[in-house]
Design a protein with these regions (language model features):
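Gly/Ala-rich beta-loop-alpha elbow adjacent to hydrolase catalytic centers
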Residues: 127-136
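Alpha/beta-hydrolase active-site loop
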Residues: 103-124
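Short beta-strand/loop motif that positions the catalytic acidic residue
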Residues: 202-204, 209-211, 215
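Conserved alpha/beta-hydrolase "acid-adjacent" motif
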Residues: 216-222
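Conserved alpha/beta-hydrolase
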Residues: 71, 78-100
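An N-terminal hydrophobic leader/cap segment in hydrolases
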Residues: 1-44
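Hydrolase active-site cap/lid region
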Residues: 144-189
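Catalytic histidine-centered segment of alpha/beta-hydrolase-like enzymes
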Residues: 241-253
Length: 265
């Protein structure tokens, strides 16, 4: 237990929550070379405007990056899709890149994904990475319908893990307890954590999970667990690509695009 005054505990507790909901931004937002000549669109969402880019006409693959990342993750797959004549839509999630809002969470990101899909459609598939996978799943559980999804290096987030990470960083127990109380009172719509494994059981889209066995951020068992829960899902396990490079590896992207195009099952 800390011996900090109650006002200090309150301030520290709110700092813990802010750190959970506020991604660290780059000093200057950036755009992938592939999207420099793309059609850009600022899309209004219930939580503020987000930036998006469409490259190509017709049914498109929506590309959803992860936590503290941005549209630049998708330069390699956008180039490949462009060469094949497949349209893509990229976005910067709330709190990221060119999007103006500061806070984000899976539910905020899910609403943004749904809004971009509606504004930049038609969307016939989603490729997500890390946090973007879970936000996309939540958007789908709320009604966003797409025939195919490919999820790369998904996490399986739990609120208990977030509080444990705070404890591991040395945050005192009474500060964490106060942060939990504030979170439950002021963020009631987020207090019940979205359960990806339970949601996967009811999904209708064809799904492909992709994971590198040496992922330093999210264990490959996450994809294996989600694949088992998701009816008819497929999985690609690779190695030596870590958490982010797996979303840019040429051979892996070829297999993802084959799946999105309907050639991979």
């Amino acid at each position: 237990m800390s011996e900090a005054p109650s006002d200090e505990i309150e301030d520290l507790a709110r700092q813990v929550i802010d750190a959970m909901l506020t991604p660290k931004r780059r000093v200057r937002p950036r755009i992938a070379e592939a999207f420099r000549d793309a059609e850009d669109m600022e899309v209004e969402t219930p939580d503020g405007p987000v930036m998006s880019w469409r490259l190509g006409k017709g049914p498109a693959t929506l590309l959803v990056h992860g936590w503290e990342d941005d549209n630049c993750l998708w330069g390699p797959i956008a180039d490949k899709c462009y060469q094949l004549g497949r349209a893509v839509v990229a976005m910067d999630l709330p709190g990221h890149g060119f999007s103006k809002s500061e806070l984000t969470s899976p539910d905020v990101a899910a609403r943004a994904i749904a809004a971009v899909a509606a504004a930049q459609g038609p969307i016939d598939s989603i490729v997500g990475h890390s946090f973007g996978c879970i936000a996309s799943m939540q958007a789908m559980s709320l009604g966003l319908a797409v025939p195919r999804v490919a999820f790369i290096a998904p996490p399986i987030p739990r609120m208990s893990d977030r509080w444990q990470r705070a404890a591991d960083k040395g945050v005192p127990d009474d500060v964490i307890a106060r942060a939990q109380a504030i979170y439950a009172a002021e963020y009631a719509d987020r207090a019940t954590s979205f359960d990806p494994e339970a949601a996967a059981e009811d999904m209708k889209a064809m799904a492909l999970f992709v994971h590198s066995l040496d992922d330093e951020s999210c264990p490959a068992s996450n994809s294996q667990d989600l694949k088992r829960a998701w009816p008819g899902a497929k999985i690609i396990l690779t190695d030596e690509l870590g958490h982010r490079l797996v979303a840019q590896d040429s051979a892996t992207l070829d297999r993802i695009i084959d799946f999105v195009e309907g050639f991979g099952g």
